[in-house]
């Protein structure tokens, strides 16, 4: 927030930018997947509260909806799934409940955030570079500090340091031998 304040954003704008990146951490007000829609699918207040309490620590909303967080009894006895189904590695509670990929993605962005500032409401495109990171951030992120920029940063700092300098240089996942040679 101090960087956003220095750039001239007001408190409401800062809150929206942060919520876009970090999410709400709650099902309250969430599109598609919320206490009302979950109750309509058989969720109890107790289970909804349990899910909601786990949300601030998950990176994806689906992590809060599994046999470990919901319990096998609830999944089998209340929701009607079978044991083999819930033990499958690719079991997706939200999809099985009828939520579409688009609905789950939208709910995920609301609850867990986009994990990037790119596309945040109010944030000026001219300010994106201030927040660039070593890698692309989130599913929607496209920006990152180029590998050569890491080397240039070290070169700029080296004259002011006595001794060695060490820096991890992050390369994109699709980097090959030719990229390193260049």
Per-region residue spans from a language model:
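Long, C-terminal-biased catalytic regions of enzyme "large/alpha" subunits
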Residues: 1-182
């Amino acid at each position: 927030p101090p960087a956003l304040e220095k750039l001239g954003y007001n408190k409401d704008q800062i809150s929206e930018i942060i919520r876009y990146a970090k999410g709400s951490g709650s099902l309250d007000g969430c599109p598609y997947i919320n206490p009302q829609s979950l109750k309509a699918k058989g969720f109890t207040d107790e289970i909804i509260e349990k899910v909601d309490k786990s949300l601030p620590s998950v990176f994806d909303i689906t992590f809060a909806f599994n046999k470990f967080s919901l319990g096998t009894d609830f999944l089998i006895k209340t929701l009607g799934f079978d044991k083999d189904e819930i033990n499958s590695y690719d079991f997706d509670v939200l999809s099985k409940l009828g939520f579409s990929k688009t609905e789950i993605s939208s709910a995920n962005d609301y609850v867990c955030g986009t994990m990037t500032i790119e596309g945040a409401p109010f944030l000026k495109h001219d300010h994106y570079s201030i927040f660039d990171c070593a890698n692309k951030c989130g599913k929607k992120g496209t920006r990152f500090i180029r590998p050569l920029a890491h080397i240039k940063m070290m070169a700029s700092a080296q004259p002011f340091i006595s001794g060695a300098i060490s820096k991890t240089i992050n390369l994109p996942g699709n980097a090959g031998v030719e990229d390193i040679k260049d």
